[in-house]
């Protein structure tokens, strides 16, 4: 269906204005799930979905946790453990770090490889690199530099093993560090994802 002008989706604490010119059946299904099952059943958007939650107008209600964005029933606000990362949105630092350390167990095996099997599926290890870089920047922004450096090196190790250091710009940037003469805030990383994996419209 054509998206009506100034239309708003409202349900369970969420008020979203879709940016899509047309609402396809799949788009309507997502709204139906939010209306009928959320928040009793959680809703997550995979990183592979790119900017889809933004297209649905849900950007104020999603929080990045590792490789997914979790939908909340209230607007997400920045805080001590929730920081805004340009191009990514608000990131849950502690949950993302726990996932990186204990759930994303593929980091070591990926870093030990010598290239990837084919270009068509190289997005799989790329997801680890992007998630690691995002987490490293988030950790650095709150002064957790040793943890940031560790995650950054792990992400870079995966990119190196996949022979994609230049794709992610690791040959041009250094790990985040504290601002001289300032507080513990770190300079933002300059690493950008490859165009095919850009997750926020207008920034690629």
Briefly describe each language-model feature range.
Residues 200-203:
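Short, intrinsically disordered C-terminal tails of secreted or membrane-associated proteins
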Residues 1-178, 184, 189-191, 198:
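ER/secretory pathway lumenal C-terminal domains and tails of membrane proteins involved
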């Amino acid at each position: 269906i054509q998206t009506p002008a100034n239309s708003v989706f409202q349900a369970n604490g969420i008020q979203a204005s879709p940016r899509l010119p047309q609402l396809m059946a799949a788009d309507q299904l997502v709204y139906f799930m939010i209306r009928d099952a959320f928040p009793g059943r959680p809703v997550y958007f995979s990183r592979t979905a790119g900017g889809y939650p933004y297209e649905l107008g849900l950007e104020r209600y999603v929080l990045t946790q590792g490789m997914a964005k979790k939908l909340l029933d209230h607007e997400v606000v920045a805080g001590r453990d929730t920081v805004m990362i340009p191009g990514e949105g608000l990131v849950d630092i502690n949950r993302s770090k726990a996932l990186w350390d204990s759930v994303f167990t593929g980091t070591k095996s990926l870093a030990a490889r010598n290239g990837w099997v084919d270009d068509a599926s190289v997005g799989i290890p790329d997801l680890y690199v992007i998630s690691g870089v995002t987490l490293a920047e988030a950790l650095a922004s709150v002064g957790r530099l040793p943890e940031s450096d560790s995650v950054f090196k792990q992400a870079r190790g995966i990119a190196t093993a996949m022979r994609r250091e230049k794709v992610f710009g690791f040959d041009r940037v250094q790990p985040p560090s504290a601002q001289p003469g300032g507080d513990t805030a770190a300079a933002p990383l300059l690493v950008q994802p490859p165009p095919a994996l850009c997750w926020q419209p207008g920034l690629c």
